[in-house]
Amino acid sequence: MITRRNALTLAGIGLVAGGGFTLLRDTEMGAAAGLPDLGAANAQDAGAIEDITLGDPNAPVKVVEYASYTCPHCATFHNNTFKEFQKEYIDSGKVHFTYREVFFDRYGLWAAMVARCAGADRYFGVADLLYQTQGQWARQGDAASVAESLKRVGAQAGLTPDALDACLQDADMAQNLVAWYEANAEEDNVRSTPSFLINGEMHSGSMSLSQIGALVDDAAS
C-alpha cells in the first residue's frame, strides 16, 4: 500500500530513487525525458478532467476506486480481482464504478496520461496493460526508458507515435490531472492506495472478490 505522504504535488514531484523519494523541480522532471514542464505558472483546472466510469449511473451502489499505476497493491487488485468484480457487480447493474488516478510520482502521471489519451472507450484496456506490465516499466529507474515503455503500451492500444508524443507533451493535461487528483484526495480524505469509497464509506487496501463483494452487498442492503 502506498500512502499519500509521498504524493506528487504541483510544487514538486516525488521520484523513487535509491530506495526513497526525492524532490525534483518541475523543470528537471520535464527535461529528464522531454516531457511536460509542470511549472506553477501553467493554468490548473481540476474541472477540466472527467471521471472514468463503468456501469449504470443509477446502480444502487457507487464505488470509487483511488489507485496509482505505480502502486503494486493496486496492480494486485486489478490483475487478480477486478475482472471478476466487473462481471459480477458492475456489468450486472449492481455497481456504478468510478476509477480515479492518484499520483505519487511522475511515472504514474505519465501512465494516466497515456491511458486517457487512448479515449474513454479504450481506457480500461490500457489500464489492464499498464497493471499487467507494471513490473516491466514502472521500476526501470531511468525516466527516458519509462517513457519509451509507456509509449509501447500506448501503441498496443492503437495510438500512433505522433499521438503519443503529443499526449506526453500536454502540459495542460498534466497540470489539470494533478490539480484534479489533489481536489479529490482532499475531499474524500484519500491517504493510501488502493482505496475504495463505497456509498460514501472509505475502505483501504487491495481486496479479494469476496472482501469487496461483501462490502458492496452490505452497502446495498
Region spans (language model):
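Glycine-rich, flexible loop/turn motifs
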Residues: 48-50, 110, 164
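Surface-exposed loop/turn and secondary-structure junction residues enriched for glycine/proline
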Residues: 41, 55-57, 72, 80, ...
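Structural alpha/beta surface segment adjacent to cysteine/selenocysteine redox centers
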Residues: 67-70, 75-155
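C-terminal cap of thioredoxin/glutaredoxin-like
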Residues: 2-24, 30, 34, 68, ...
